[in-house]
């Protein structure tokens, strides 16, 4: 089996276990046996909006208009091939982790991540669904928007992102989810106001 790891950083020889600054996961090396899935990690982002169909097919569903293009067009990075090993399988399809360092056996420079995704789609390895598809089913769209509202609001609240509105993470939510950002921060600011009795 081939194991992949993607990074915006070139020249790596060994992957050291690290703790994600964005996700609550243990210190580990994350790998995938699916090249198309690895491409998502060419950039560092606050969310990765991919999933799997019941049939096990990888897909990306734009959570906001032109999300894939906006996040990945013109972005480059390295796709690493890692040594074979007895890696632990996670609950996420095609994902494996290692608590130990992992040696790199090969590397491929990806000039444009968005173009690489289009090639993977043409090869039948991923389904890329644009925002219009996401919004075409009113019932599913409402459920997904409600889920995004809840998840992003909790993230803004728990990590206190709203207290640093000029941070990169705050800008990401302000730009891509303006309604959720406004509604959440308005609620939080109201809660912070002193009550006069």
Language model regions located:
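Short, well-structured hydrophobic secondary-structure segments
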Residues: 29-50
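Short, surface-exposed beta-edge/turn micro-motifs
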Residues: 1-2, 25-29, 35, 75-78
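A general structural signal for short secondary-structure junctions and capping/turn motifs
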Residues: 21-22, 29, 68-72
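Short, flexible beta-strand-to-coil junctions
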Residues: 5-11, 33, 82-87
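Conserved NAD+-utilizing ADP-ribose enzyme module
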Residues: 44-197
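ADP-ribose/NAD+-binding catalytic cleft of ART/PARP-like enzymes
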Residues: 1-26, 41-44
């Amino acid at each position: 089996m081939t194991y992949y790891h993607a990074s915006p950083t070139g020249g790596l020889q060994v992957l050291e276990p690290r703790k994600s600054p964005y996700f609550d996961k243990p210190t580990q090396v994350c790998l995938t046996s699916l090249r198309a899935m690895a491409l998502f990690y060419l950039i560092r982002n606050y969310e990765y909006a991919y999933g799997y169909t019941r049939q096990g097919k990888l897909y990306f569903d734009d959570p906001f208009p032109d999300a894939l293009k906006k996040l990945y067009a013109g972005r480059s990075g390295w796709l690493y091939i890692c040594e074979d090993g007895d890696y632990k399988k996670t609950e996420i399809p095609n994902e494996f982790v290692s608590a130990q360092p992992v040696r790199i056996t090969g590397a491929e420079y990806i000039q444009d991540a968005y173009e690489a995704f289009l090639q993977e789609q043409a090869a039948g390895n991923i389904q890329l669904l644009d925002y219009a598809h996401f919004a075409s089913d009113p019932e599913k769209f409402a459920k997904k928007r409600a889920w995004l509202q809840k998840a992003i609001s909790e993230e803004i609240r728990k990590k206190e992102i709203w207290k640093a509105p000029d941070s990169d993470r705050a800008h990401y939510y302000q730009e891509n989810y303006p309604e959720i950002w406004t509604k959440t921060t308005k609620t939080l600011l109201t809660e912070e106001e002193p009550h006069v009795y």
